[in-house]
Amino acid sequence: MEINKDNIANWLMQLQDSICSALEKADGKSKFLEEKWERAEGGGGRTRVMKDGAVIEKGGVNFSAVHGKTPEFLLRDKEHSSADKNASEFFATGVSIVIHPNSPMVPIIHMNIRYFEMTGGVKWLGGG
């Protein structure tokens, strides 16, 4: 697979599908409901929410891929000093997950993975 923003976004959509499928199977009762959305400045995403399950009280697995004009604060940020100060465009995509189980003995899950790039070649992959 060539590493480019479109392939990364497609892989992250597949990751969202895979995670939702596995959680539905593990829960056995509830299913994710999906709402698609668009960002006026460019891009959009899919919000998926599950609630009142056998194991999961409420959870969300969300995907986004947005683009537009690079915010000025990123162009001024010293951490990104290698960025082209005239970089006018950015692209960002990611998946975020928040799961609240029914049992207080089971930990809450909160994680995300994201990819960001700006015109001029600055790009990074992160998560937490």
Language-model segments: residues:
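Internal mixed beta-strand/loop scaffold within catalytic domains of large alpha/beta enzymes
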Residues: 47-125
